[in-house]
Amino acid sequence: MRVADFSFELPDSLIARHPLAERHGSRLLVLDGPSGALAHKQFTDLLDYLRPGDLMVFNNTRVIPARLFGQKASGGKLEVLVERVLDSHRVLAHVRASKAPKEGAVILIDGGGEAEMVARHDTLFELRFTEEVLPLLERVGHMPLPPYIDRPDDGADRERYQTVYAERAGAVAAPTAGLHFDQALLDKIAAKGVERAFVTLHVGAGTFQPVRVDKIEDHHMHKEWLEVSQDVVDAIEACRARGGRVVAVGTTSVRSLESAARDGVLKAFSGDTDIFIYPGRPFHVVDALVTNFHLPESTLLMLVSAFAGYPETMAAYAAAVEQGYRFFSYGDAMFITRNPAPRGPEDQA
């Protein structure tokens, strides 16, 4: 399978660079996986597609203000993007500077704070701060907006680039399908008899990295930490027993659940995952998916194609472009039911 199979033309004007006034104000493109039929709706119409007894699984990770600006004590400006918090004082981070800091180099953080570069791990730098990391980030850090939102972060992003149910700090990118849900909509979903459960996957900056190989089978995913608790496993078993569907909110929820069921049996799991879902890989847990529109040639578009079928997915994206849907993190959403017999690019005539 070629990466180029997942390319499509996207006008720059369709990239959403700011959130809408209301979280639930987005449009919703509904894709029926078994038939490929499309319906153009509003996000609040999601209620009509959920059934009593369904279980919605959300990712409760919390985005940290992971971008820092500063300079080396020896001179030279730099930018730090925290990838993973290792403990109360240490992180793994991307460092952008004219000259990479060497081991032992001291970094002075704008707004106050200091860190030492203690080791390098491939492209990541291990930094040790003189004070606790999370409070420092909250005080002087910037929200790590994706590279395609080519503007500085502002005060609104602190609220809007975060789900209303975010709880466990550690992500450096938002699980964006969840951004559409406000508390009023969550209450309506609960009132309909839809259950909810929460997994955690701390989204890393690697989610924005392009696929740099020609054949997708040669691509290696970055690692991210996740947790699927026994309570979630029990909730899914109860959902199955009552005939409900497992509805994943976001590709990170999909990757969490399918990572915990790699051998076909769902079990509680806590640790790193590098699961790569592309056409041809079976799904063991998820029946329906709420997701945003993803970048051309991205691993997330490949995941959606595996779930809905390649021709159905690409046709839906073509329709979304034609209808002027807003793309990416602050954009519109899809609701997709799983295609029981998905085809890949190689199955095209």
From Swiss-Prot:
It is an enzyme of class 2 (transferase). GO terms for cellular component: cytoplasm. Its EC number is 2.4.99.17. GO terms for biological process: queuosine biosynthetic process; tRNA wobble guanine modification. SUPFAM superfamilies: QueA-like. GO terms for molecular function: S-adenosylmethionine:tRNA ribosyltransferase-isomerase activity. Monomer. Transfers and isomerizes the ribose moiety from AdoMet to the 7-aminomethyl group of 7-deazaguanine (preQ1-tRNA) to give epoxyqueuosine (oQ-tRNA). NCBIfam families: PRK00147.1, queA. This is S-adenosylmethionine:tRNA ribosyltransferase-isomerase. It comes from Pseudomonas putida (strain W619). The lineage of its organism: Bacteria, Pseudomonadati, Pseudomonadota, Gammaproteobacteria, Pseudomonadales.
